[in-house]
Amino acid sequence: MIKKASLLTACSVTAFSAWAQDTSPDTLVVTAIRFEQPRSTVLAPTTVVTRQDIDRWQSTSVNDVLRRLPGVDITQNGGSGQLSSIFIRGTNASHVLVLIDGVRLNLAGVSGSADLSQFPIALVQRIEYIRGPRSAVYGSDAIGGVVNIITTRDEPGTEISAGWGSNSYQNYDVSTQQQLGDKTRVTLLGDYAHTHGYDVVAYGNTGTQAQTDNDGFLSKTLYGALEHNFTDAWSGFVRGYGYDNRTNYDAYYSPGSPLLDTRKLYSQSWDAGLRYNGELIKSQLITSYSHSKDYNYDPHYGRYDSSATLDEMKQYTVQWANNVIVGHGSIGAGVDWQKQTTTPGTGYVEDGYDQRNTGIYLTGLQQVGDFTFEGAARSDDNSQFGRHGTWQTSAGWEFIEGYRFIASYGTSYKALNLGQLYGFYGNPNLDPEKSKQWEGAFEGLTAGVNWRISGYRNDVSDLIDYDDHTLKYYNEGKARIKGVEATANFDTGPLTHTVSYDYVDARNAITDTPLLRRAKQQVKYQLDWQLYDFDWGITYQYLGTRYDKDYSSYPYQTVKMGGVSLWDLAVAYPVTSHLTVRGKIANLFDKDYETVYGYQTAGREYTLSGSYTF
């Protein structure tokens, strides 16, 4: 009997575009339909980043990893740990669904967007990134795309690492995975990272007083996982992690009032699951609990002072997913339930509230001759706004062997968060934000070049905005986003090249003005090679012009921010089979630029690190 992976591989095409280092079309991904499938059978553009990629790039943050990927635009209010936003294909930062091991990241706060500057890079073993609508599979938020951060380690062993760098950066990490008998595996990790940072000098955006201090970041992380195989088909796991972060930043100064310029974030997450992995049928049941407490306070008064603010969120989820091989493809179905609660006294929500959501979904994948068809439909029942349905469909045609045309259409939405509904400025009558997206793409393998080019359009309605006059949130905005994305990877002798180009025209559909903080064009290029046992890497990124607001005076003025070209250089050397040393220069030519108006970036930075494995 043919197993699922073999069958799906057999029905997949020979070679299609893959952006990351591992360019095999048979690389398995789980994010598209919640179960493993060869990447070549996923019609949506998909990128996989491995832990080996992260180590080779010597990334010290999740944002540094994501900024290298097609369609991603990262903005940040300064350096490490400072507030950041992820824009995928021009959509809002709140239109990106971030998963941790397939479970929605707990998001505290009124923005409803993921700030991955706070998520420890030490936990990341793999990232799967899908562009385009995915609400028909996952529900709310998946308008621009899905980022699935996977913490599960692939190989046993122990690693001890340490790193130092500019701005008094230091990082110490110990992780181990051990086999207990033939069927049980234990993983443990501890990580400490700290930087004094630098002065982001956000004068004008923070009131009338400049705050000449270093804006540092401290993070402490613990992780543990236990996995057990009951039989060849049945397995289970228990997993938990937590991190304790402190960030200093430049806050708005008001004479006579405490200066809330310190952020303290506590986050913990626990999940357990049971999986059945048969030859034709797969099923999994996962439950999770997460709790985050996000304080902003004046350190002279403490985080429990009446002037401090607190965002506290608890999230409970249950997921039951199933997949069965049918013909040259599969059919999947599942249900997931989520409950989010806030605690009375939370900064943006005066009283305790909860929001519950139950979703049922159906997915399908099938190959018929030279055609591949993919579809999904989902219905969500939300305690705040009732029932909402989404769907998507894609078709791929291999018109010549190794060349494929893809067309897709999908709907998606963004649910309201508790802060927007019941916060100080909340509006309980808000509707969800909605999206309709079209995409057409060609991809293939030509003379050793694995390439893909696509064009897309995204119409977003009922966007939630804030009214300065009524001091309330309301539905009124509309956005029209058009874009082109091109990716390619190829080898020339010992050199490996990976390149992408993005053109994004993201506009307010009512006023025809550009959406803020999105670069209109981006070029990204990665060059890797090995010479005399040294592993070298050069990263280039061009960020095009973008617009932002100058909040130093009212009425706020729109400002145009120029483009910039950035270069990084990284090198690694294996001293022995166990010990590797690495060095990196980020922003090699020390360019001055901003991604958020008024907030400086770090300039040239150096890091030196070493790791010992056994």
UniProtKB/Swiss-Prot annotation:
It comes from the Bacteria. GO terms for cellular component: cell outer membrane; pore complex. Its main location: membrane. Cyanocob(III)alamin binds at residues 83, 85, 92, 110-111, 251, 309, 517, 551. A motif (TonB C-terminal box) lies at residues 597-614. InterPro entries: B12_transptr_BtuB (IPR010101), Plug_dom (IPR012910), Plug_dom_sf (IPR037066), TonB-dep_rcpt-like (IPR039426), TonB-dep_rcpt_b-brl (IPR000531), TonB_rcpt_b-brl_sf (IPR036942), TonB_rcpt_CS (IPR010917). Residues 38-152 form the TBDR plug domain. This is Vitamin B12 transporter BtuB.
